[in-house]
Design a protein with these regions (language model features):
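Residue-level recognition of single "structural anchor" positions
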Residues: 1-142
Length: 142
């Protein structure tokens, strides 16, 4: 599955351009080992109302692909958040929040806070930017 493979530049560009593709990618990584409802522990699910979400067939609780991940409560498009995470973790680029703001059309402080969140995760896992897989970042509960 995608978790075991490197994220190619082509796949990354596809994810940067479309929030639905990004949500499906995150969902595939998040539930690679199967869905387990956080409320009741049931493993059967159906597709939820939003892209990439899953709904427990027992208690009907819906969990989004971004819930309990680095992208939880992200108030801007997930594809833009994924771009920031990708450039920090995979490419190891040290891009300023002002540059992210210009590139993505977001507020500078929004970019700064999200980049800070990613860097805190990198420090938490005890790795430098070059050595941490982006999948680790995606699955980190924040």
């Amino acid at each position: 599955m995608l978790l075991k493979k490197e994220i190619t530049k082509e796949l990354a560009e596809k994810l940067f351009n479309d929030s639905d593709n990004t949500l499906n990618f995150i969902a595939n990584i998040k539930w690679e080992n199967g869905f387990v409802c956080r409320k009741c522990g049931h493993t059967n699910y159906c597709e939820g109302k939003s892209t990439g979400s899953r709904r427990c067939t027992r208690c009907k609780t819906e969990e989004s692909a971004t819930a309990h991940t680095m992208f939880h409560n992200c108030k801007f498009p997930v594809n833009k958040a994924f771009y920031i995470a990708y450039t920090v973790c995979v490419e190891g680029k040290d891009i300023s929040s002002y540059q992210y703001s210009d590139q993505l059309g977001l507020n500078q402080m929004t970019c700064w806070k999200f980049r800070k969140r990613i860097r805190e995760c990198v420090i938490k896992h005890g790795a430098d930017n070059q050595n941490i897989p982006i999948q680790t970042i995606l699955l980190t509960e924040y």
